[in-house]
Amino acid sequence: MTEKISILIVQSNPQVGNIDKNKQIVIDHIESNKSDLIIFSELMLTGYPPEDLVLKPAFMEKVNNAISDILNCSKNSNSTIIIGTPFLEESKLFNTALVIKKGKILHKHHKMALPNYGVFDEKRIFSNGEQVSIIEFNGIKLGLFICEDIWVNDT
């Protein structure tokens, strides 16, 4: 196990729908930091809540292009990156945390507890993830959760 791990938690204010600006925030942090682990927020690439924007194919194409750009940027970094993004898999749209290192997606955690009350209507847009994600990072087991996952008993 590593004795010391440096972790950067990025608290930014991503703009809903401004994928280019949000992606640039991510790339700037990857290029300028040497942290072992860089963690970005839920739905960092799209801003929160993206609502019906993620249902538009052209918007999701921009999201996928941004993910590709971030993967490419990560090739030159030793950091492991965790970033929130909408992610289409097997014809289902998920609110996902991607774990990225050296140009590869190492793991995907799909949010399990989708809120559907008050101003939140994630169940209308996203599919539920089905399992808790545990990853190994520098000899340490880490659980991945997205927002409401952490305080709902059945997740």
Cite the ranges covered by each PLM segment.
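Enzyme catalytic cores with a strong preference for nitrogen-chemistry domains
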Residues: 1-155
